[in-house]
């Protein structure tokens, strides 16, 4: 429906005044916004990148990753850092839990010599450091581990047993309001790791909740629920965890998709194992009996050998990855869900998702 000429002139004058006062780009028509194509960073898991719909975690946004203890939260964020560093990006790790293991981080592919690290004394200090890094425009990825460990200054200076009702929630709420705009302007990805708590007296529905109040839930563009659903075994030895991630909230694509992958102890996400599974599912890799082949060439007998072959042939692995991304990311109705091939090396646990 056409706007009459007088209204168009008035609108043009108003837009000109706003741009003069607040700068070019402060207001625009949504279709003209060049930032609509969101830049993303890989999570290190191919199936999770596809479940997110955009090929990874969005830059300039807030992301929350939560789950039970030992579910792979820190491992997943370290894989994001490693992927970002491979693209030449600068990353920072705010270690509020004082538990970051640099040796483990290096094993996952993190360049620890170029990783900025801070172990703040208080929650306010941690969030101010995040804000300063974001405003600098020089840091691309910031990880905060974890929201539960962001202790307000008043609580640290008080006695154990004192009541500090709502302090952490108020601190997080103020920080979110301040950070959201700065992150967008500097195109910085901020990832919060969070823990799960149980609500008391919940008879029906899910009693689980995350720490730090509700502000983070609202401001996060992506929320990921990560759970350990099984054990990866070699013979009698447990060598890793079978992991499921559910995209609980997603502002950049359709939510509620989920991905399953293996986290191997000391190695991180079994990326090449995912590549074999998704390659077979999309008929890029042929499987006949126990043998796997690509373009008529046998690449291994059994999934473990096929995975090892792809690891030794990164050019072919990249070619298959590119084809899988093109097939699944171009189709909005696609899902990366797959059953692990013949349940090979997977033992179920009783943990609820």
UniProtKB/Swiss-Prot annotation:
Keywords: ATP-binding, Cytoplasm, DNA damage, DNA recombination, DNA repair, DNA-binding, Nucleotide-binding, SOS response, Stress response. ATP binds at residues 67-74. Its main location: cytoplasm. SUPFAM superfamilies: P-loop containing nucleoside triphosphate hydrolases, RecA protein, C-terminal domain. Residues 330-353 are annotated as: Disordered. Pfam families: RecA, RecA_C. It comes from the Bacteria. GO terms for cellular component: cytoplasm; DNA polymerase V complex. The keyword DNA repair applies. Induction: Induced by DNA damage, repressed by LexA. Induced in response to low temperature. Sensitive to temperature through changes in the linking number of the DNA. Induced by cold shock (42 to 15 degrees Celsius) (at protein level). 5.1-fold induced by hydroxyurea treatment (at protein level). mRNA levels are repressed in a mazE-mazF-mediated manner. GO terms for biological process: cell motility; DNA damage response; DNA recombination; homologous recombination; recombinational repair; response to ionizing radiation; SOS response; translesion synthesis. Residues 339-353 have a biased composition (Acidic residues). It is found in: Cytoplasm. Disruption phenotype: Triple mazE-mazF-recA mutant cells no longer undergo an apoptotic-like death upon DNA damage characterized by membrane depolarization. The rate of DNA-strand exchange is stimulated by RadA. Required for homologous recombination and the bypass of mutagenic DNA lesions by the SOS response. Catalyzes ATP-driven homologous pairing and strand exchange of DNA molecules necessary for DNA recombinational repair. Catalyzes the hydrolysis of ATP in the presence of single-stranded DNA, the ATP-dependent uptake of single-stranded DNA by duplex DNA, and the ATP-dependent hybridization of homologous single-stranded DNAs. Polymerizes non-specifically on ssDNA to form filaments; filament formation requires ATP or ATP-gamma-S. Interacts with and activates LexA leading to autocatalytic cleavage of LexA, which derepresses the SOS regulon and activates DNA repair. Interacts with the C-terminus of RecB, facilitating loading of RecA onto ssDNA at chi sites. Interaction is decreased by ATP. Belongs to the RecA family. HAMAP family: RecA. This is Protein RecA. It comes from Escherichia coli (strain K12). The lineage of its organism: Bacteria, Pseudomonadati, Pseudomonadota, Gammaproteobacteria, Enterobacterales.
């Amino acid at each position: 429906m056409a706007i009459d000429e007088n209204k168009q002139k008035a609108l043009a004058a108003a837009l000109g005044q706003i741009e003069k006062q607040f700068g070019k780009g402060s207001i625009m028509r949504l279709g003209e916004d060049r930032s609509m194509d969101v830049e993303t960073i890989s999570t290190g898991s191919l199936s999770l990148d596809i479940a997110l719909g955009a090929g990874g975690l969005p830059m300039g946004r807030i992301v929350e990753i939560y789950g039970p203890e030992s579910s792979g939260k820190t491992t997943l964020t370290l894989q994001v850092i490693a992927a970002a560093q491979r693209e030449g990006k600068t990353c920072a790790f705010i270690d509020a839990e004082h538990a970051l293991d640099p040796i483990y981080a290096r094993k996952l592919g993190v360049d620890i010599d170029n990783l900025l690290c801070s172990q703040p004394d208080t929650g306010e200090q941690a969030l101010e450091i995040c804000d300063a890094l974001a405003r600098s425009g020089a840091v691309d990825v910031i990880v905060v581990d974890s929201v539960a460990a962001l202790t307000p200054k008043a609580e640290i200076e008080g006695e154990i047993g004192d009541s500090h009702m709502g302090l952490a929630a108020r601190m997080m709420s103020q920080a979110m309001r301040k950070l959201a705009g700065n992150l967008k302007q500097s195109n910085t990805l901020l990832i919060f790791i969070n823990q799960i708590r149980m609500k008391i007296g919940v008879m029906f529905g899910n009693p689980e909740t995350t720490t730090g109040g509700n502000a983070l839930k609202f401001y996060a563009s992506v929320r990921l629920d990560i759970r350990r659903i099984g054990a990866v075994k070699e013979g009698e030895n447990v060598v890793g965890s079978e992991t499921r991630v559910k995209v609980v909230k997603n502002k950049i694509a359709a939510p509620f998709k989920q991905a399953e992958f293996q986290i191997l102890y000391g190695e991180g996400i079994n990326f090449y194992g995912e590549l074999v599974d998704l390659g077979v599912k999309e008929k890029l890799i042929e499987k006949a009996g126990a043998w796997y082949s690509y373009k008529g060439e046998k690449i291994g007998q059994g999934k473990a050998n096929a995975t090892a072959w792809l690891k030794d042939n990164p050019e072919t692995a990249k070619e298959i990855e590119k084809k899988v991304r093109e097939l699944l990311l171009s189709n909005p109705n696609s899902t990366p869900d797959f059953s692990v091939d013949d349940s090979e090396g997977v033992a179920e646990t009783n943990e609820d998702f």
